[in-house]
Amino acid sequence: MNRKARRCLGHLFLSLGMVYLRIGGFSSVVALGASIICNKIPGLAPRQRAICQSRPDAIIVIGEGSQMGLDECQFQFRNGRWNCSALGERTVFGKELKVGSREAAFTYAIIAAGVAHAITAACTQGNLSDCGCDKEKQGQYHRDEGWKWGGCSADIRYGIGFAKVFVDAREIKQNARTLMNLHNNEAGRKILEENMKLECKCHGVSGSCTTKTCWTTLPQFRELGYVLKDKYNEAVHVEPVRASRNKRPTFLKIKKPLSYRKPMDTDLVYIEKSPNYCEEDPVTGSVGTQGRACNKTAPQASGCDLMCCGRGYNTHQYARVWQCNCKFHWCCYVKCNTCSERTEMYTCK
């Protein structure tokens, strides 16, 4: 059984909230029937199911990219009232907020970037059919800058293109939320593209740099997380502009009187104000902060006063015991003392 394939499949089914199926390798997926597997994945649009059935190898990578985006979201908001969690049905893209808030904007952007990042990485590593290194970045010499393309450049255009077709296919309805979601998807992918790296290697006698070959690589995903968190803090409130004939929204504009200015391509946009995320609310998708750990003395969002929304907090005391001050005695044993520490933990009421 292919251990790497089993691990990949495990990540996929875990991210989908499904039972961990211990099956081995891509051939096992085919044997089970791609249509059976794809029909069991919740929350996919018809176009996405068709892609899943035709490219089951890619759907595994998409699941990993989506989970990478969700993990980064949880890291960036780990100390806030909203910690990238939501109520509702779990899909390949996680549980989704029902309000078109700036938190929803961040979620869509980070997942779109995660899927594009994962697809591009899989192509570079030779783990997907129909793609590989960027063929246009091979051999061309940049005389003015003294280097030429070499190595294996990440084919970010393929990764973004494939991810766009799959991720955007879930936006079926023609309404303002769809326009918002599509804009934030594109913003996440655009920010990924803008943060691609150029790596180079020198060639020459005795360490000289007579010639230099360069190639493009993907950025660390944590770096994208920080960039998108800054975009979240500066998110733009927008509203739809409707066509006069069918009254359907056609594009988004910044929500200001007498203004028809559109947001920038890399802006995160939202159409509704955020709830306070203090209480569990099925209407908004908020899970509330009851039971969340908080910092008694911190003045920031992680502090108990803000995290618990004025409800107060519970104090939990526990003892931590460990071996300490260990010394080697001749001959031949080690003697240690037992150390202990009483610790307090605080959780929101």
Curated annotation (Swiss-Prot):
KW Nucleotide-binding (keyword) present: no
Cellular localisation: Secreted, Extracellular space, Extracellular matrix; Secreted
Residues carrying sugar: N83, N127, N295
A GO MF label: receptor ligand activity
Pfam families: wnt
Effect of K262A: In 4A; abolished interaction with RECK
Effect of A109T: In FUHRS; retains activity that is significant but not comparable to wild-type activity
Single GO biological process annotation from the record: dendritic spine morphogenesis
Major location (coarse): secreted
SMART domains referenced in this protein's UniProt entry, alphabetically: WNT1
Tissue: Expression is restricted to placenta, kidney, testis, uterus, fetal lung, and fetal and adult brain.
Alphabetical keyword list: Developmental protein, Disease variant, Disulfide bond, Extracellular matrix, Glycoprotein, Lipoprotein, Secreted, Signal, Wnt signaling pathway
GO cellular component, one term: extracellular region
Signal peptide range: 1-31
Post-translational modification: Palmitoleoylation is required for efficient binding to frizzled receptors. Depalmitoleoylation leads to Wnt signaling pathway inhibition.
Note on domains (UniProt): The intrinsically disordered linker region is required for recognition by RECK in brain endothelial cells.
Associated pathology: Limb pelvis hypoplasia aplasia syndrome: A syndrome of severe deficiency of the extremities due to hypo- or aplasia of one or more long bones of one or more limbs. Pelvic manifestations include hip dislocation, hypoplastic iliac bone and aplastic pubic bones. Thoracic deformity, unusual facies and genitourinary anomalies can be present.
Protein role: Ligand for members of the frizzled family of seven transmembrane receptors that functions in the canonical Wnt/beta-catenin signaling pathway. Plays an important role in embryonic development, including dorsal versus ventral patterning during limb development, skeleton development and urogenital tract development. Required for central nervous system (CNS) angiogenesis and blood-brain barrier regulation. Required for normal, sexually dimorphic development of the Mullerian ducts, and for normal fertility in both sexes.
Subunit: Forms a soluble 1:1 complex with AFM; this prevents oligomerization and is required for prolonged biological activity. The complex with AFM may represent the physiological form in body fluids. Interacts with PORCN. Interacts (via intrinsically disordered linker region) with RECK; interaction with RECK confers ligand selectivity for Wnt7 in brain endothelial cells and allows these cells to selectively respond to Wnt7. Interacts with FZD5.
Protein name (record): Protein Wnt-7a
Organism per entry: Homo sapiens (Human)
Record gene name: WNT7A
